[in-house]
């Protein structure tokens, strides 16, 4: 409220979707908060020139974190959640930005991968996957093709829950 009273008209909110135990109700809470902020601005300033940006990344389970054993949501489920949130926030004063679900999936595969992925990475590089951290160069289909050619199932790295007693590829790192 103080920010609006002092002339601020733009707010950016950061969230993560796809966390373990997340429900659609949690996503609805994101929409509700964004709408409430816009309404609060109108109450305080009497104008409708507020801009709320909601930036939502996808959960990527990473080694050495409490969630390292948890699966990542499938690409289809992340895309469903993104669409659900978009449908809830249909307001010209609120903009939703999303991390690409397919990029997040590849991040999870590589983050929890083992030495076998070296074959995939080399093959992808040879096929031109060099600037894939840039959205305009990322080619998901080419990466999936490389996984298939190497006979490696990327879902085993990203979407599989891991047993806490399982030997992890990163366990040797101290």
Label for each model-derived stretch:
Residues 1-65, 77-101:
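Conserved C-terminal portion of the radical SAM core fold
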Residues 18, 60-61, 65-68, 158, ...:
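Generic, ordered loop/turn and secondary-structure boundary motif
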Residues 22-23, 74-75, 171-174:
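General structural signal for secondary-structure boundaries
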Residues 68-74:
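Short glycine-enriched, charge-decorated loop/helix-capping segments at active-site entrances
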Residues 88-174:
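Radical SAM enzyme core and accessory elements
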């Amino acid at each position: 409220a103080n920010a609006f009273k002092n002339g601020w008209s733009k707010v950016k909110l950061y969230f993560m979707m796809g966390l373990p135990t997340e429900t659609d109700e949690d996503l609805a809470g994101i929409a509700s908060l964004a709408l409430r902020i816009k309404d609060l601005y109108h109450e305080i300033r009497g104008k409708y020139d507020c801009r709320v940006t909601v930036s939502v990344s996808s959960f990527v389970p990473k080694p050495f974190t409490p969630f390292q054993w948890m699966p990542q949501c499938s690409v289809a489920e992340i895309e469903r959640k993104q669409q659900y949130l978009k449908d809830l926030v249909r307001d010209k004063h609120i903009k939703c930005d999303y991390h690409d679900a397919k990029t997040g999936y590849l991040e999870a595969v590589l983050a929890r991968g083992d030495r076998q992925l070296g074959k995939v990475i080399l093959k992808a590089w040879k096929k031109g996957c060099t600037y894939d951290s840039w959205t305009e160069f990322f080619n998901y289909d080419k990466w999936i093709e490389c996984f298939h050619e190497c006979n490696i199932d990327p879902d085993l790295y990203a979407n599989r829950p891991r047993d806490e007693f399982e030997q992890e590829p990163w366990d040797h790192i101290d």
